[in-house]
């Protein structure tokens, strides 16, 4: 019953909206921690609660506890303090009880209290136990507009950020205070605090068009809390990577990380875009491949020829030494070579591309458990 009450497919976002209204009324200071538009927050929180209640119903606690601990650590960047968790507990309990008043009894009350004690207790405890700063700031030192919709942004951080190659971090830009976006570093962690991001302007988006169109050297960004677990097991066999556009970033970070060792599994990277000119990082990939024989790179574009606007941006024609450029959609191009079932498979890019590529590989016979990708939005 608790799960159904918060399920967005069953109208649960209305309850979440009521919860936030009550929370802000109980604790006025909380409202200033969130962006003005909370529509996306309602959806995300509704989905998270639905999953958490479902896991508890099925008596699975390990993943929910890990998720809640990460959530608690992550909320430190918003300025959430211990007192906010107590007001959150009160608001959520009161909202659930009001929503389910017709069915509320002692058993449901005990269940709700136990669940909320777990949810909020784990978050509060994890946040309190975290010793490091909740975020680190950095200065944009270089901006390269490598295509009409893509920018490469390099920053110098005030202090090094702890993350692993292949992870993504939350980023806040000065034009959009209190709004955080996930971006994947395109390089392994640097002891001197250098970091690089590849950003594509998404039509209808708020933050990515600003980053691509308005970012200037000297801008101050705020970064926090790495997430994600994409990785390469150097003893786990050869590797297939499929990167769509700026989805290249975390895969390139993993490739660069592998260059620390002399012996590695073979890695075959398919790097795709709409047009040849959007394969913006081919020169870097060629440089890495020329010095590391375990790396193969296949450039792929949906269209064979570039549009007229390509003349305004750097030439990224594949240099000699890379595989022949291929035309087509990534799922079809990748799977025409087989199912790659003997490989560790990593896919990164837009949700539609990731889903289509994963489904195509599984349909060909690739084991689903061998496929890694970050959580899909939407």
Positions of predicted regions on the chain:
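Reductase modules of NAD(P)H-dependent flavoproteins
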Residues: 9, 270-378
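A short, basic/flexible loop-to-alpha-helix module at the beginning of a structural domain
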Residues: 225-236
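Phosphate-binding glycine-rich loops and their immediate beta-loop-alpha structural context
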Residues: 241-242, 246-261
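Structural motif
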Residues: 238-240, 268, 344
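Ferredoxin-reductase
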Residues: 132-220, 237-238, 273-274, 300-304
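Short, conserved phosphate/pyrophosphate- and ester-handling motifs at nucleotide-, phospho-/glycolipid
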Residues: 166, 247, 350
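Core of compact, soluble alpha-helical bundle domains
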Residues: 1-136
């Amino acid at each position: 019953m608790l799960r159904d009450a918060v399920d967005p497919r069953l109208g649960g976002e209305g309850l979440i909206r009521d919860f936030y209204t009550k929370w802000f009324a109980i604790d006025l200071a909380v409202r200033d921690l969130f962006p003005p538009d909370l529509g996306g927050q309602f959806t995300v929180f509704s989905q998270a609660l639905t999953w958490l209640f479902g896991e508890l119903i099925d008596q699975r606690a390990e993943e929910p506890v890990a998720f809640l601990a990460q959530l608690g650590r992550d909320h430190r960047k918003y300025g959430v303090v211990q007192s906010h968790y107590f007001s959150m507990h009160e608001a959520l309990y009161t909202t659930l009880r009001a929503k389910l008043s017709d069915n509320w009894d002692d058993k449901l009350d005990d269940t709700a209290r136990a669940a909320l004690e777990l949810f909020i207790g784990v978050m509060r405890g994890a946040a309190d136990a975290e010793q490091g700063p909740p975020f680190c700031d950095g200065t944009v030192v270089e901006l390269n507009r490598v295509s009409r919709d893509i920018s490469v942004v390099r920053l110098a951080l005030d202090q090094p950020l702890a993350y692993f190659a292949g992870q993504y971090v939350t980023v806040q830009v000065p034009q959009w205070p209190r709004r955080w976006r996930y971006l994947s570093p395109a390089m392994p962690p640097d002891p001197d605090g250098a970091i690089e991001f590849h950003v594509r302007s998404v039509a209808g988006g708020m933050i990515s068009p600003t980053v691509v169109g308005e970012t200037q050297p000297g801008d101050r960004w705020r970064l926090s809390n790495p997430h994600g677990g994409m990785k390469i097991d150097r003893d786990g066999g050869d590797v297939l990577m499929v990167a769509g556009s700026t989805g290249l970033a975390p895969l390139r970070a993993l490739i660069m990380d592998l260059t620390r060792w002399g012996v590695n599994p073979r890695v075959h990277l398919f790097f795709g875009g709409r047009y040849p000119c959007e394969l913006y990082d081919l020169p870097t990939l060629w440089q890495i491949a020329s010095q590391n024989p375990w790396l193969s790179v296949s450039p792929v574009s949906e269209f064979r020829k570039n549009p007229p606007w390509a003349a305004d941006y750097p030439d990224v024609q594949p240099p000699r030494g890379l595989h022949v450029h291929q035309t087509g959609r990534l799922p079809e191009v990748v799977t025409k070579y087989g199912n790659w079932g003997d490989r560790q498979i990593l896919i990164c890019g837009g949700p539609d591309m990731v889903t289509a590529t994963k489904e195509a590989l599984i349909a060909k016979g690739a084991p689903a458990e061998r496929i890694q990708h970050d959580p899909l939005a939407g």
